[in-house]
């Protein structure tokens, strides 16, 4: 049997009306600590639930993060190589610039020396001109001698001269052979005379 918000069942009575009229009334009765603990516990459970749900997502992103890290590493390596190449190029250009400056300074000193001592420079020019003239004369003499030699060689190489020289050589060879033959004959006659004289003496002695 129901009377208001109270149920009667035999001897027991169950009250079903609201325990507190408002939250303020409950706080006033139990204090803030109890309610605060419940609120914090609820919030902590929510945070843990979010972390649990987000863990698979983080694991799935691990390969992509590794790939990004490798790409960043490669980009950094290329950048360092480019910086090294640029540094070497700058060093080379600096050295070339220094050499250019030294060459300009040397030319400036040479020009200043010529302006300060024009007579010396003129004397050097005259000496160089004389040296060149002497060398030209020697080259001309050598060229003339070479030309004469070439003419002689050309003349000596003609077929007619070759035949004449060959005839002269043959004549000289014949004369030489004749002289050698006459000399041999004279030697033989002398030997015969020397060998015949004792024989004649022996022949005369046997007959007398």
Swiss-Prot record:
This is WEB family protein At2g17940. Belongs to the WEB family. It comes from the Eukaryota. Keywords: Coiled coil. Residues 78-113 form a coiled coil.
């Amino acid at each position: 049997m129901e009377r208001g918000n109270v149920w009667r069942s035999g001897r027991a009575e169950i009250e079903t009306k609201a325990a507190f009229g408002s939250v303020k009334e409950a706080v006033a009765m139990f204090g803030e600590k109890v309610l605060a603990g419940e609120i914090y516990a609820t919030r902590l459970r929510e945070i843990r639930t979010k972390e649990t749900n987000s863990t698979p997502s983080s694991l799935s992103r691990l390969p992509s993060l590794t790939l990004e890290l490798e790409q960043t590493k490669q980009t950094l390596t290329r950048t360092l190589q480019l910086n090294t190449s640029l540094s070497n190029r700058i060093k080379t250009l600096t050295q070339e610039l220094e050499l250019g400056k030294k060459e300009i300074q040397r030319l400036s000193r040479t020009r200043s020396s010529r302006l300060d001592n024009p007579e010396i420079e003129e004397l050097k020019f005259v000496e160089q001109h004389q040296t060149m003239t002497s060398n030209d004369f020697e080259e001309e003499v050598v060229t003339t001698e070479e030309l004469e030699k070439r003419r002689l060689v050309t003349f000596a190489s003609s077929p007619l001269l070759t035949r004449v020289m060959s005839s002269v050589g043959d004549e000289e060879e014949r004369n030489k052979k004749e002289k050698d033959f006459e000399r041999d004959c004279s030697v033989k006659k002398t030997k015969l005379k020397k060998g015949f004289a004792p024989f004649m003496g022996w022949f005369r002695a046997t007959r007398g």
